[in-house]
C-alpha cells in the first residue's frame, strides 16, 4: 500500500466518480483505476461497487475510507510541521576578519 493508492481511493470515494477523481489528481482514469484495483487486491476486498453508470462504496470501502482519509490528513499535517520547523531554523555563520597593519613598504 502506498500514498498514491490511498489518495486515489479517497478521491474516488469523495467524488464517487473515477473521471472526476482523475481530473482532481491530474492523473488519467486508467491510472486511478489501476491504483484502486491494486489496493483492493492488496486488501483482499472490493472497496467500490461499480456499474456502468455509478460508483458506490461497499461496507468495507466505507470503513476503510475513514482511516485512509485520516492517514492522508495526518501525513499532510506532518509535512507542514516539518516545513514550519525548517523555516524557523536559524542558521548562523561567522565572518572573521583578520586585521593586518600595512607593511612599511606599502606606506
Segments the model singles out, each with a brief description of its role:
Residues 9, 39-40:
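Conserved amphipathic alpha-helical core elements
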Residues 10-27:
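Short helix-boundary/capping micro-motifs
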Residues 40-59, 80:
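A short LG(V/I)-centered, amphipathic sequence patch enriched
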Residues 42-43, 64-86:
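Alpha-helical linker/hinge and terminal dimerization helices associated
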Residues 91-98:
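Short, well-ordered beta-strand elements
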Residues 99-107:
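Single conserved hydrophobic/aromatic residue that forms the stacking wall/gate
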